[in-house]
Amino acid sequence: MKNTAVTFKESKLRNEKLTMLTAYDYSTAKIIDEAGINGILVGDSLGMVCLGHEDTLSVTMEDMIHHTRAVTRGAKNTLVVADMPFMSYQTSVYDSVVNAGRLIKEGRAQVVKLEGGIEVCDKIEAIVKASIPVMAHIGLTPQSVNAFGGFKVQGKDKEAAKELIRAAKAVEKAGAFAVVLECVPTKLAELISKEISIPTIGIGAGAGCDGQILVYQDMLGMYSDFTPKFVKKYANLSEEMNKAFTKYIEEVKDGVFPGPEHGFKISDDVLEKLY
């Protein structure tokens, strides 16, 4: 069954947990799609895990369109959500609609995601009015890392917690069909999930959310620069890849690879005519 913004909301009504992972290329998207994951986020996290930047701020619209287009070719039943990169929507309502439209039209995404609470509700409303579904994102919003002073848990004191509750209700009212809660205390995220009717997708927000999302390189043990506390590693592919690469080097140097079975034959008759 094809996952859509509508089926996400229906899953919450049925109390069925939603699953999401990031992807940035065709091959990974195809594997994730075949596994039955509900949603793929083409995240601006690609700036860190794919392009080697220290944060997400350097990612451009062209980067997002390029990677989103690749992902949508591999995702047949999985909902594809494209991140709106830094400064693609903060500048004006007009810019937010235009750039959201580019991610849908050129990137072929089904949904766009933007970070922020009450301060971006005018953008959410305008994008939704343009018939583009929006996934909101509150709590730790990586594009605001400089304002936060680093990657820190949000909503730990009374006022900050109340502000997150207000933000969740505001983005719902603005028309978002779902909201990501990032690095929010578990009990607060559970409370927010009960307070709003749209699905909450948690990342570092505990099991009380309506769904979960992880960066796939994190959960597969492929990104060694930094592993957040909230990540569970389901594999250690970095180690396995290193072993495979080392073995490849050894076999090439020792003349073991390629073997006869990896080559193509030519008849002796043809070969003799070459001399």
From Swiss-Prot:
Binding site for 3-methyl-2-oxobutanoate: 44-45, 83, 113
Gene Ontology biological-process annotations: pantothenate biosynthetic process
UniProt keyword Cytoplasm present: yes
Cofactor (UniProt): Mg(2+)
Catalytic activity: 3-methyl-2-oxobutanoate + (6R)-5,10-methylene-5,6,7,8-tetrahydrofolate + H2O = 2-dehydropantoate + (6S)-5,6,7,8-tetrahydrofolate
A cellular-component GO term for this protein: cytoplasm
Active-site feature positions: 182 (proton acceptor)
Pathway stated in the Swiss-Prot or TrEMBL entry: Cofactor biosynthesis; (R)-pantothenate biosynthesis; (R)-pantoate from 3-methyl-2-oxobutanoate: step 1/2
EC class (word): transferase
Signal peptide segment: none
Protein name as it appears in the record: 3-methyl-2-oxobutanoate hydroxymethyltransferase
Native species: Enterococcus faecalis (strain ATCC 700802 / V583)
